[in-house]
Swiss-Prot record:
UniProt GO MF annotations: imidazoleglycerol-phosphate synthase activity; magnesium ion binding; phosphoglycerol geranylgeranyltransferase activity
Pathway(s) where this gene product acts: Membrane lipid metabolism; glycerophospholipid metabolism
GO biological processes: glycerophospholipid biosynthetic process
UniProt cross-references to InterPro entries, sorted A to Z: GGGP/HepGP_synthase_sf, GGGP_HepGP_synthase, GGGP_synth, IGPS_HisA/HisF
Residues annotated for sn-glycerol 1-phosphate binding in this entry: Y172, L173, E174, A175, G176, S177, G178, G203, G204, G225, T226
Family: Belongs to the GGGP/HepGP synthase family. Group II subfamily.
Residue ranges of the TM segments: none
EC number(s) stated in the UniProt entry for this protein: 2.5.1.41
Name of the protein: Geranylgeranylglyceryl phosphate synthase
SUPFAM superfamilies (UniProt xref): FMN-linked oxidoreductases (SSF51395)
Length: 256
């Protein structure tokens, strides 16, 4: 049986292939000013990720609002089995591979699978990898993450390779929301080189310069969330840096 890639994933792959990198903005549905954030980012992001909260209220309404405001692909990033709504376009069907708790590795996605099928959501199979300093953030605490040390980039590379063998097409290297520092360039590069799948990098990316470095190191997607909440206008320069890096990376690869 041939594996079918859905419309949203195909669209994102095309952006990555033609522009070298994509920019996703993470919006927390619990943010009171989510409509304002959505209005600010709609002309700059390639897709919107919704999620990251515990005990989300009014997820259907929030997702519908953001979709209507932005007109962009809406991808769910569930913090638990209750983080799914039929109002989205797709969902990251993910495993927190380096959690110490099997609930986050496999049980949670298994429990949510039937709801996803019922809603007809497109699934993007993804390895979610918690990278130092994620243990100091909410997701690290809740997800009981056995964080991957920054000084051991090859471990993230092996997880990403393992994910590709499991059939996952995306790996998210996550330092955590509001992290003190981002995933290292070396770790990004090794993960991309070993796995060949789409590498998403998020957490601690506060400046366009850092975003540029991550893309040039091998990142296919950059995610910002906390930065966007604090300064919605920051997405303008962030997009410029990501897209410039994407084109520069394509030129560099074409010469090899």
């Amino acid at each position: 049986m041939q594996i079918k890639i859905g419309e949203i994933e195909s669209k994102l792959n095309k952006i990555i292939e033609e522009e070298g990198a994509a920019y996703f903005v993470l919006i927390d549905p619990d943010e009171k000013n989510y409509r304002e954030i959505a209005n600010h980012v709609k002309d700059y992001a390639d897709a919107i990720i919704i999620g990251g909260s515990i005990g989300i209220i009014n997820l259907d309404e929030v997702t519908k609002d953001i979709k209507e405001i932005t007109g962009l692909p809406i991808i769910l990033f569930p913090g638990n089995v209750d983080g799914v709504t039929k109002e989205a376009d797709a969902v990251f069907f993910m495993s927190l591979m380096n959690s110490k708790n099997t609930y986050w590795n496999m049980t949670a996605p298994t429990l949510g699978a039937l709801t996803i099928k019922k809603y007809g959501l497109e699934t993007l199979p993804m390895a979610y990898l918690g990278i130092e300093p994620i243990s100091k953030t909410a997701v690290g605490f809740v997800g009981e993450v056995n964080e991957i040390p920054q000084k051991k980039p090859e471990i993230a590379g092996l997880y990403s390779l393992s994910a590709s063998y499991f059939g996952m097409r995306w790996a998210y290297l996550e330092a955590g929301s509001g992290a003190e520092y981002p995933v290292s360039n070396e770790m990004v590069g090794i993960s991309k080189k070993l796995s060949g799948i789409n590498i998403i990098v998020g957490g601690g990316i506060r400046t366009p310069e850092v975003a540029y470095e991550k893309v040039m190191s091998g990142a296919d997607v950059i995610v910002t969330g906390t930065l966007t909440e604090k300064d919605p206008q920051a997405v303008v320069e962030m997009k410029k840096a990501i897209k410039k890096a994407g084109l520069d990376k394509l030129k560099m690869l074409s010469k090899k």
